[in-house]
């Protein structure tokens, strides 16, 4: 076990249990992630009762196998465990409530289209699982990957070719539903069904008035991009009736948005949605499926709350609401119980992937107490700050902080006015940060009057840990929508994390940093970390990145894909890896933006030939440039 260190607040020894609390891993880990007694993060890919894998040791093994950091590690066993948990929750509620139909989980591949992800999800045994496609490329993929007889739901904007492909899929033996999102799609379905010679299975997506509170609320409600209004719904039904295809209308679909934090919001919208089921049945349509869309969230921050990055319910609660409300409505109306679909892609995939990187550099404030040999000769503002360097009574801690903050503001203004020199400004800043560090050590989070100042000091005193990755490529949602992802060191968790840091990436962009961190059961602006030792590879893991992050990542500054690998666990607890994908090279990235490496080499040769270099230097330069094109954009 790692050496224990002293805790600041009460003098007791720091233990692994303290780190488990600080990083909240029990709350967001969902039984898959924990901190072992040796102070390393472990993963249990087959659930809380399965054999643990030491993640820090695993990274060492993968690096020995030739992989480099940053590294995306996928655990496909987690995918299958998530499928079993989701389908198990619905099946249990169906049995408990005596619901007279069944449930099929749909995986919307837009969440993560990686082959290993899709294949492992649909390979889960003894469950009912289907696929959803929202574009022609996705439809082409699922037509190939779905097992014969498997369910395929087609959403999104559709042209004639899209609809023809979907109908061909039906003739190939798939259970295909074409969901009408826009009135303009109706005529295309009618015409292509005649051309292909098949009775289409149609779904109707309704646009609900109800809105859920989430970062993706705009996907629901009256201003939603997709779905039919009440008037449009009646018009579409009539057009299918006139074409003699109304008996192919088999599915009702709605979507309230992704990551719905509050289950009560979902209940409110679902109450509206199931009214449409009753109305469509009353119109004589044989609707016997209901696709409740997405919304099942992930507790990213572990607070089990209505925070945007959390949920105040679990999978069983969600399944109970869907099954229970449907049964109650159908029984009251004398309607058959419909087959239930849900598109819970985030809940299925988020946990299975971890991004691992290392700290490459540390930038910290100089908060050592300065030695001032000529204090009397310093400007008044410096003398005032120097007076605050001494001991401070406990009851004066916050007052001292506010005074010091006022003084450092004055120092900045005086420098701008030319009243103090650069050296004097630097001395004032060193005094200020030394005061802040000392006061920080006196503050106690348990004392309410200290909390505001403590939060500010945690922010001001945070080190900058430069890490070997790109926020824009690997964690785009943290930048784009302020998504909170759990982050912690992979090792040294038997030691007290005695520093706080903001993680910054390699990009030449001020937004290339992570600004929110899970800290116990709250969100903070900096992360508790350890001081990086000389020559140490200090490894950081970013967890729950399996949903959307890979496919949404962009190439800002031409940082491309990282190394990635799929790690599987055998029945005996042993592991093996497969599906290794190496990082994009600089050459790959240049080609993507239509810069030909061959043309660049020609230009390099011209420049080298025109430079005042020896023959040996020319060869060395050309070799270095040629080799550079084959390297990773990330640091080696």
Swiss-Prot record:
It comes from Pseudomonas aeruginosa (strain ATCC 15692 / DSM 22644 / CIP 104116 / JCM 14847 / LMG 12228 / 1C / PRS 101 / PAO1). It comes from the Bacteria. It is an enzyme of class 4 (lyase). Substrate binds at residues 290-300. GO terms for molecular function: arginine decarboxylase activity; metal ion binding. The modification N6-(pyridoxal phosphate)lysine is found at residue 110. Belongs to the Orn/Lys/Arg decarboxylase class-II family. SpeA subfamily. Keywords: Decarboxylase, Lyase, Magnesium, Metal-binding, Polyamine biosynthesis, Pyridoxal phosphate, Spermidine biosynthesis. Catalyzes the biosynthesis of agmatine from arginine. This is Biosynthetic arginine decarboxylase. Its EC number is 4.1.1.19. It holds the Pfam family Arg_decarbox_C. It catalyses: L-arginine + H(+) = agmatine + CO2. Its cofactor is Mg(2+); pyridoxal 5'-phosphate.
């Amino acid at each position: 076990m790692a050496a224990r260190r002293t805790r600041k607040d009460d003098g007791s020894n720091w233990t692994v249990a303290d780190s488990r609390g600080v990083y909240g891993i029990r709350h967001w880990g969902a039984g898959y992630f924990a901190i072992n007694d040796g102070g390393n993060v472990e993963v249990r890919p087959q659930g809380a009762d399965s054999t643990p894998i030491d993640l820090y040791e695993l990274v060492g093994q993968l690096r020995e196998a030739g992989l480099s950091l940053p590294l995306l590690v996928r655990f496909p066993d987690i995918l299958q465990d998530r499928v079993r948990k989701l389908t198990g929750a619905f099946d249990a509620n169906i049995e408990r409530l005596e619901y007279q139909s069944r449930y099929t989980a749909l995986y919307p591949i837009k969440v993560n289209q990686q082959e290993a992800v899709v294949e492992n999800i649909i390979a889960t045994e003894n469950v009912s699982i289907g696929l959803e496609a929202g574009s022609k490329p996705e439809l082409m993929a699922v037509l190939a990957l779905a097992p014969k007889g498997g369910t395929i739901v087609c959403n999104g904007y559709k042209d004639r070719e899209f609809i023809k492909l979907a109908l061909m899929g039906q003739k190939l033996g798939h259970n295909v539903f074409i969901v009408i999102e826009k009135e303009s799609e109706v005529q295309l379905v009618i015409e292509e069904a005649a051309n292909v010679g098949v009775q289409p299975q149609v779904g109707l997506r309704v646009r609900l008035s109800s809105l859920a509170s989430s970062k993706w609320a705009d996907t629901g409600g009256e201003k939603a991009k997709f779905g039919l209004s009440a008037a449009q719904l009646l018009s579409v039904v009539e057009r299918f009736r006139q074409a003699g295809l109304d008996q192919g209308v088999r599915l009702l679909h709605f979507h309230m948005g992704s990551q719905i934090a509050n289950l009560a919001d979902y209940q409110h919208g679902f109450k509206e949605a199931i009214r449409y089921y009753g109305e469509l049945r009353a119109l004589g349509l044989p609707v016997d499926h209901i696709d409740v869309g997405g919304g099942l969230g992930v507790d990213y921050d572990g607070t089990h709350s209505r925070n945007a990055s959390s949920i105040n319910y679990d999978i069983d609660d969600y399944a109970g609401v869907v099954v229970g409300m449907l049964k109650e409505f159908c029984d009251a109306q004398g309607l058959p119980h419909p087959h239930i679909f849900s598109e819970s892609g985030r809940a299925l995939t988020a946990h299975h992937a971890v991004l691992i990187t290392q700290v490459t550099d540390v930038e910290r404030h100089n908060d050592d107490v300065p030695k001032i040999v000529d204090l009397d000769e310093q400007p008044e503002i410096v003398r005032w700050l120097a007076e605050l360097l001494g001991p401070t009574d406990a009851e004066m801690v916050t007052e001292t902080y506010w005074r010091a903050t006022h003084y450092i503001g004055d120092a900045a203004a005086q420098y701008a006015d030319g009243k103090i020199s650069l050296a004097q400004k630097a001395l004032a800043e060193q005094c200020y940060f030394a005061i802040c560090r000392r006061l920080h050590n006196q503050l106690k989070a348990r004392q309410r009057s200290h909390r505001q100042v403590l939060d500010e000091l945690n922010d001001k005193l945070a080190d900058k840990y430069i890490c070997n990755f790109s926020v824009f490529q690997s964690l785009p949602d943290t930048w784009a929508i302020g998504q909170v992802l759990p982050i912690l060191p992979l090792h040294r968790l038997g030691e007290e994390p005695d520093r706080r840091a903001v993680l910054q990436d390699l990009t030449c962009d001020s937004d290339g940093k992570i600004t929110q961190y899970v800290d116990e059961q709250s969100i903070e602006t900096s992360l508790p970390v350890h001081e990086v030792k000389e020559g140490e590879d200090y490894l950081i893991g970013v967890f729950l990145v399996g949903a959307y992050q890979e496919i949404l990542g962009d190439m800002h500054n031409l940082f491309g894909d990282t190394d990635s690998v799929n790690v599987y666990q055998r029945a005996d607890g042993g592991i093996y890896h497969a599906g290794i994908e190496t990082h994009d090279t600089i050459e790959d990235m240049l080609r993507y933006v239509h810069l030909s490496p061959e043309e660049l080499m020609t230009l390099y040769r011209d420049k080298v030939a025109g430079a005042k270099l020896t023959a040996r230097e020319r060869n060395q330069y050309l070799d270095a440039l040629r080799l550079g094109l084959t390297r990773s954009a990330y640091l080696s």
